[in-house]
């Protein structure tokens, strides 16, 4: 019995020594052995089918391999698939960081605080967005793209040529930008082109509201119930009106202007008379002082 025990103990010691020697000769840790197995399996992996954990279908390799390659990638040159030149890392890394990003604080390049995701994700979602249905924040139904894309295109747009939908040739920017600037505009001070101080909004907004305005009910400032349009539109049409031919409603062929303009001039004259008295009546042949409105 004692002999059998000693013999079995000797065999166990020999086996441990033998396997340890083999491992020392190969000098390969267990984790690297697994990596070697994965590398041998790469050609057999179907990117569209079930994948082993840690495998990226975009790059056709494992994440650990990609991370080791980061310092060698040139952002301005050819890049491996799934690499973002804006962030200097792969999309899969960025997606894992999303919950940690503060929209109101410092943000990594390429991150949109409006959508809470990276631009590259949003661009992939464009074909799935319904312009007439619920839309993700920062998406413009007029242009069919996100505002951040449109802002990058501004220098390339020709104001006098074909323009993308939602672009204002008067302001050289998109309507959505102008609407965000409304609270900062001073009606009595310098105003951006296309802004109406009477209505406190841009002309393009007012034109879209025309079908909803009731001529007999409350009307927005600057709207003429006679013409069914705003005064600023009518003033632009003055040179095209023929006094002797058909005329738009509210136009006076005697004065060559609209009645609403004349009423505003009467009000200014009345204010002048109240402040300075009646303009003096001059004798024939004398030069009278010219009245200048307020």
UniProtKB/Swiss-Prot annotation:
Coiled coil: none
Extent of Basic and acidic residues compositional bias: 28-44
Signal sequence segment: 1-23
Similarity annotation: Belongs to the bradykinin-related peptide family.
Tissue specificity as recorded in UniProt: Expressed by the skin glands.
Gene Ontology CC annotations of this record: extracellular region
GO molecular function, one term: toxin activity
GO process terms (BP): defense response; eating behavior; vasodilation
Record carries keyword Disulfide bond: yes
Residue span of region Disordered: 28-230, 238-257
Keywords assigned: Amidation, Amphibian defense peptide, Cleavage on pair of basic residues, Disulfide bond, G-protein coupled receptor impairing toxin, Repeat, Secreted, Signal, Toxin, Vasoactive, Vasodilator
Disulfide partners: 282-288
Sequence positions bearing Valine amide: 292
Subcellular location: Secreted
Pfam family, one: Bradykinin
InterPro entries reported for this sequence: Bradykinin (IPR009608)
Name under which the protein is recorded: Kininogen-1a
């Amino acid at each position: 019995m004692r002999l059998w025990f000693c013999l079995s103990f000797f065999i166990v010691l020999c086996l441990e020594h033998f396997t340890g020697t083999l491992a020392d000769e190969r000098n390969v840790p267990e984790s690297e052995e697994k990596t070697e197995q994965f590398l041998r399996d790469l050609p057999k992996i179907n990117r569209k089918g079930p994948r082993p954990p840690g495998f990226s279908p975009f790059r056709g390799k494992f994440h650990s391999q990609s991370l080791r390659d980061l310092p060698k990638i040139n952002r301005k040159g050819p890049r491996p698939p799934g690499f973002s030149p804006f962030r200097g890392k792969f999309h899969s890394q960025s997606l894992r960081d999303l919950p940690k990003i503060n929209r109101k604080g410092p943000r990594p390049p390429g991150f949109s605080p409006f959508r809470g995701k990276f631009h590259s994700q949003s661009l992939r979602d464009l074909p799935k967005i319904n312009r007439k249905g619920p839309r993700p924040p920062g998406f413009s139904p007029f242009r069919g793209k996100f505002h951040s894309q449109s802002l990058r295109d501004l220098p390339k747009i020709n104001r006098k040529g074909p323009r993308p939908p939602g672009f204002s040739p008067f302001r050289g920017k998109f309507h959505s930008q102008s609407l965000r600037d409304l609270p900062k505009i001073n009606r009595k001070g310098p105003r951006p082109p296309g802004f109406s101080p009477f209505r406190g909004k841009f002309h393009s907004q007012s034109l879209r509201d025309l079908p909803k305005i009731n001529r007999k009910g409350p009307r927005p400032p600057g709207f003429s119930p006679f013409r069914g349009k705003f005064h600023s539109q009518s003033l632009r049409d003055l040179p095209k009106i023929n006094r002797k031919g058909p005329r738009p409603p509210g136009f006076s062929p005697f004065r060559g202007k609209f009645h609403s303009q004349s009423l505003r001039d009467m009000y200014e004259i009345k204010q002048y008379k109240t402040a300075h008295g009646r303009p003096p009546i001059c004798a024939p042949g004398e030069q009278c002082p010219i009245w200048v409105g307020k």
